[in-house]
Amino acid sequence: EFMMETMVLDITPQRKVIATNKKQGVIELEGRSIVLAMGCRERTRAQIQLPGARPSGVYTAGTAQRWVNIEGYMPGKKVVILGSGDIGMIMARRMTFEGAKVERVLEIQPFLSGLSRNYVQCLLDFDIPLQLQHTVNRIIGNDRIEAIESIRVDDNFSPIPGTEEIIPCDTLLLSVGLIPENELSKKAGVILDPMIGGPVVNDDYE
């Protein structure tokens, strides 16, 4: 049986699932086994502690992807992308297709985060510059983002003074990784791995 439009509110250590939907209200379900498949979500500017003002125009790459592909809405025309993950590089190409100018892709690591294939097809083929060991030092703007200040980092990810550069833009897309949805796992008493953030499992993924 499938229950659509149903949200799980709680999972108890006794394997009881508390859920809610429009038709039945709050319901309680019980089973011998519960499969946790909540997935993950994108890191936001708060989770990477991005400094600077808080104007509009700062989005995750996945949000921008949904707007362009499904809702037909362009996030902006002059774009900087933080992070060289696959979604970020794919969105660099997609924004270019839609007429935007992608000024730069910044990556804090000294290496590419995504697939080499996407780097070639999404950045190199469209002459979109990639700067490794660079990050956003500051967001500039009031109501809407007007620019970002980029900065080079050393091997310990510490900013290097004197390497700052102002890059005008009206949109900043974040492609800085994913974090697991752990709220229900915690409520169910599942032990979490501090290294990866996900649940500790055995060889059978239990």
Whereabouts are the PLM-identified features?
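Residues forming the flavin
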Residues: 1-206
